[in-house]
From Swiss-Prot:
This is Inward rectifier potassium channel 13. A motif (Selectivity filter) lies at residues 119-124. The modification Phosphoserine is found at residues 201, 287. Keywords: Cell membrane, Ion channel, Ion transport, Membrane, Phosphoprotein, Potassium, Potassium transport, Transmembrane, Transmembrane helix, Transport, Voltage-gated channel. The gene is Kcnj13. Residues 78-105, 123-131 are extracellular. The chain crosses the membrane at residues 51-77, 132-157. The keyword Cell membrane applies. The lineage of its organism: Eukaryota, Metazoa, Chordata, Craniata, Vertebrata. One of its GO terms (molecular function) is inward rectifier potassium channel activity.
């Protein structure tokens, strides 16, 4: 089915982005005029998790630098208020207690702040135990520094261990096909787990997005099933799975797929699965446009047997489709002919002759 040459009567779906969800599952929705104030910043953890790595590294580096600079200013202020900037630290006055040895400039204060935060050990600069303000500031910097390091370490671990990263190994076919199964037309797509570790409790759902005449997007649920599994979820996902949606007269796709140039729509497919090792739920998404649904096609065979009898998956055939040749329907029901027996013009009895075979 090719809808690239047809006019699309959906202004919202036909602008810069022809799809609401990209093939790799990212949303193209843009929130214009949304207020991103304190309410948005309250979810700082979620903001960090959604950041790209380069921005996350920049934020963390800036956090450390700002932390060092703030306490460098405070250490410099302590030295200035204590009168440590004008005296000779090697030969201090007898009645003067130096708070931090050899802090005579802002550069020295920044260096001391860096040494305190990284706990690399004091050299010529060290705080005096007889200066209460220096001891208090040292405790505050150490406490806040440990909190900052714990937060950054946790953010790194959480971002690396996100279930979203496991979902990248789930792959959908680029195209969906409409083929016959058990004599009924079905919309079919395939999904593969490209990692050897299995997924469990696999669930698939789909939503059909259409634009109404009033400009609103209408959502319709589309049900998919997996072969003969009666439950809503597949308990084990290690080899490619094929999902079917039977196109009946009540199906929301029935009228859309009857035309050679259908109106624009988007079918978004969601797959949720549980990681066997961690028990976390990961989700993978994709979408199909009318131009990505092939009529009268089926997918090429994926499963083969190896030399030792083991199953093998030919992933090079994962996105391949082949034309579906319609098979003539042969009726095996006998053809019956009613015959009447007449004697002397009167009907005596009647019987049937069953003729089997093909009729022209």
């Amino acid at each position: 089915m090719d809808s690239r040459n047809c006019k699309v009567n959906a202004p919202l779906l036909s602008q810069r982005y022809r799809r609401m969800v990209t093939k790799d599952g990212h949303s193209t929705l843009q929130m214009d005029g949304a207020q991103r104030g304190l309410v948005y910043l309250r979810d700082a953890w979620g903001i960090l998790m959604d950041m790209r790595w380069r921005w996350m590294m920049l934020v963390f580096s800036a956090s450390f630098v700002v932390h060092w600079l703030v306490f460098a200013v405070l250490w410099y202020a302590v030295a200035e208020m204590n009168g440590d900037l004008e005296i000779d630290h090697d030969v201090p006055p007898e009645n003067h207690t130096i708070c931090v040895k050899h802090i005579t400039s802002f550069t020295a204060a920044f260096s001391f702040s860096l040494e305190t935060q990284l706990t690399i050990g004091y050299g010529t600069m060290f705080p005096s135990g007889d200066c209460p303000s220096a001891i208090a500031l040292l405790a505050i910097q150490m406490l806040l520094g440990l909190m900052l390091e714990a937060f950054i370490t946790g953010a790194f671990v959480a971002k690396i261990a996100r279930p979203k990263n496991r979902a990248f190994s789930i792959r959908f076919t680029d195209l969906a096909v409409v083929a016959h199964k058990d004599g009924k037309p079905n919309l079919i797509f395939q999904v593969a787990n490209t990692r050897p570790s299995p997924l469990t409790s696999v669930r698939v759902s789909a939503v059909l997005y259409q634009e109404r005449e009033n400009g609103e997007l209408y959502q319709t649920s589309v049900d998919f099933h997996l072969d003969g599994i009666s439950s809503e979820e597949c308990p084990f996902f290690i080899f490619p799975l094929t999902y079917y949606h039977t196109i009946t007269p009540s199906s929301p796709l029935a009228t859309l797929l009857q035309h050679e140039t259908p109106s624009h729509f988007e079918l978004v497919v969601f797959l949720s699965a549980m990681q066997e090792g961690t028990g976390e739920i990961c989700q993978r998404r994709t979408s199909y446009l009318p131009s990505e649904i092939m009529l009268h096609h089926r997918f090429a065979a994926l499963m083969t047997r190896g030399s030792k009898g083991e199953y093998q998956v030919k992933m090079e055939n994962f996105d391949k489709t082949v034309p579906e040749h319609p098979t003539p329907v042969v009726s095996k029901s006998p053809h019956r002919t009613d015959l009447d027996i007449h004697i002397n013009g009167q009907s005596i009895d009647n019987f049937q002759i069953a003729e089997t075979g093909l009729t022209e």
